[in-house]
Amino acid sequence: TDDARFANAADRAMPVLLNLANNGQSWRENGISHARVVARVGLQIEAGCPALWRYLEARLEEAREAGLFGA
């Protein structure tokens, strides 16, 4: 259902938001790349809430440029 897709998007977005808030600490500590984050959460978030994905996609690109990823 649409509600389930939205709930899944929210669940997938939370770890991304937390990592953005702590300047990518977990991503750096665990060697997580930008591509890996996008591959893991992008499709699910976009399917459930395209506006949220557009926002996160832009923030993830800023994080990549700032060197917040581990690999």
Where do the language-model regions lie?
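Alpha-helical, largely C-terminal catalytic domains
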Residues: 1-71
